[in-house]
Amino acid sequence: MRKIFVKTNNVRNFIGLVENLQNKPKNIPKMGLVYGEPGLGKSQTALWLACKYDGIYIRASNLMTSRWLVEEIVREMDELPRYLTSDNFNVVISKLIQKPRIIFVDEIDYLMNNYKSIETLRDIHDKTDCPIIFVGMGLALRKLERYKHLYDRFSEIVKFETFEIEDLSQIFSQLSEIPFTPDSIEYIHKKYNRFRQIVQLISKLETIAKENGLTEITFEIIKELV
């Protein structure tokens, strides 16, 4: 299987969100939300974009406090966390003013019930004018709407949708070293619509094809295997 980052429609929408936030005037809020069901490639895309744009990628976790969150941001800036949370916060603000960077906060659902952490991210945004992008699950938008004063700052929102047949064809053509016929991809599309599932399926079918000397995967073969 080829190691290629496939730019599906979801990925292109995520890229568009990032570029739109970067290009907004100073007086326009630069917070964004990317949300959707699990397994659609949100985290992989956020990590890829953080590398592409020299951003800061933070993965929130259960029980994460605002202190812990700020310390993680400080570490991602290649700084040693200070003892006082206020000192760490000032380091983050100072560094971002010197060198503006996008902050990606993945698994944001873990922080949605932690008002202080959400407020901390808002304060970082307001003091630095740096884009901050929340990445969350299917209910993230609804949870975010509870914070009315914060929700107004989200000028860009993208929902990751399940794959269309065109997305699936693109994924198979770019990742698989064994060709798949169009009707075989249509059959797979009816059964699989999560990126993780599809990658695992490609790996499995490539192995079977190589072991059996198959030069392509057809509809008849897929029906027997999937």
Walk through the language-model features, giving the residues of each.
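Walker A/P-loop nucleotide-binding motif
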Residues: 25-47
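Conserved AAA+ ATPase "SRH/arginine-finger" region at the nucleotide-binding site
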Residues: 60-62, 138, 155-168
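A short helix-turn-beta junction within AAA+ P-loop NTPase domains corresponding to the substrate/partner-engaging
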Residues: 55, 145-162
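C-terminal alpha-helical "lid" subdomain
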Residues: 2-16, 39-48, 149, 166-226
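Conserved P-loop NTPase "ATPase switch" module shared by AAA+ and STAND
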Residues: 93-117, 131, 136
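Sensor-1/coupling segment of RecA-like P-loop NTPase cores
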Residues: 32-38, 124-148
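Conserved NTP-binding/hydrolysis module of P-loop NTPases
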Residues: 54-55, 66-83
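Conserved catalytic segments around the Walker B and adjacent sensor/switch elements
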Residues: 32, 50-63
